[in-house]
Amino acid sequence: MEKKKLSLPAQIFIALLLGIVVGLAFYFMGKPEITTNYLKPFGTIFVNLLKFIVVPVVLLSMIDGIVSMGDMKKVGSVGWKTVAYFLVTTAIACVIGLVFANIFNNAGLFPTLQLVDGQVWEKATSANFMDTLIGIFPSNLWESFRTSNMLQVIVIAILLGGGILTAGEKGKLAQDMVTSLYAVIERVMAFIISLSPIGVFTMMAWVVATQGPEILGSLGIVLGCAYLGYIVHAVLCYSVSAKAFAGINPIDRKSVV
């Protein structure tokens, strides 16, 4: 009888628990530097890989989707709706995050972080509407990729996808190339995601070993706040979007199936 392989979420959960155990062991042994020198680098590599894959996935998936429409009128309509949807959902996420952060902070549930000696906390400055609008449009392709500016990446994808469509037969090679590259990047993304247990284990072991067991309570509170925010955001944005754009009732299981 073939053994059933553990699902990825189960592997991540086990890695989380093992990371806590290993981190506590090194903390009480008084050797947290071992996790810093030999475990944290692997966690950093995993985080770097996640950052690396985001832009190619968004860019190629959008170009592939736009090209598959085959109609520039649809591209224009979908393009501005995508940008508008991104801005609205991001704004809602920011508001939810600020509300939950203030509630938890005023209740004294969040840990207080101490600044390193000599470090200065710089207050964020708000940009006006026109600056935000200008910032959506890229001036340098590679700079948009380097900074992972998702709005600019979306605009680049819309422009390139529209260019491929309007090029007609001459754009066929580019279309085939995008489809092939997207298939490849999907495989790369699947591989990186499969490394999640390693990333979770190494980072959790390092955090617990260097911060001590008291960090577990703080992390639990922060994660709890984050997941509450995710749930509220999903209900407000994605459930409403499913009903508005696809006519799907998220509460009715039959309509989803």
Language model regions located:
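Conserved small/polar residues in nucleotide/adenosyl-binding loops
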Residues: 256
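Perimembrane loop-to-helix junctions flanking transmembrane segments
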Residues: 34-44
